[in-house]
Amino acid sequence: MGCANSSQVNAQDHAAADKDTTKSNDPIVLQRADPFIYKHTDGYYYFTGSVPTYDAIEIRRAKTIEGLQNAEPFTVWEKHESGPMSRHIWAPEIHYLDGKWYVYFAASEEDDIWALRPYVLELKGQDPLKDEWVELGMMQAADDDPKSFTDFSLDGTVFEHNGKRYFCWAEKTGGQFAASNLYLAEMESPIKLKTVQFMLTTPDYDWERIDFWVNEGAAVIKNEGKIYITFSASATGASYAMGMMEADENADLLDRNSWIKSRYPVLETNEEKDIYGPGHNSFTVDENGDPIMIYHARDYEKAVGDPKMVPATDKRPLEEIKADPLYDPNRHARMMEVKFDNDGRPVFEFY
């Protein structure tokens, strides 16, 4: 398969090296939640994430991760005025599959702001910043799958393993206030699933159930014969935290018995370092080839929603809106070196 240099990371392929990069918890890109970086074979890092207004998809690129901070952002697609893809443009990811560029993102409708579904863009060309992106429509379930993408669905990511390509996404069942679970399926094409959805994880523990029952924002890293899928849990404020699933590299990824889930968060708020609600991460490698995690977090505890970001169809009282961290724009993209314990498991530690 033609995934030239995926955002998934094979950590064992990268020898440790001394880093020239200054280690810091400071943001690399301001006000970009759900950050995603793809390092392509052209030597560029391609960055995207949720813009604060949730109304467009931006991409920037640079030769270094740090260079992304000052790289010019290009708006490559904007929301529709009404109907599908007209509200809540969330968590875009850029991937290179079978010689073509794709963007996966979630979107809802102006008149139904929680009707989120995963959508796909395809590039007609090879320059993601300048060539035309066209809409392929909503991600499609397998022919024998009546459930996938029929309810609140978001945070889709793509990865390859043992010659197969997979799509992992979050979906609620039973309406807006039901649990958000993570699902996994093999892909038939960049826009369609091949297999029926498999529920990878549901919010089992108290730390996954703060304000909302949430598992979302999956990302993949591999090391020493294991595949790991990190995810984020709870509401988008200071309670937001990361968990992790692991499986043997030769296991059937669509078998529940293949996976072990972390009982506790692998990354959470650190008040001493003023890092609140870390999560919705992605993985890449730095210029030395060492694994790096990109994540978002705020630098204060109490998020304050900006009424200007709220859809006109959201009729909640102003005080309730101001208390909603979803509409606080200051989730900043940050980076972290990925370390490994004696058993080869990823360890995530602030500097």
Roles of regions detected by a PLM:
Residues 3-351:
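Carbohydrate-active catalytic/glycan-binding domains of CAZyme proteins
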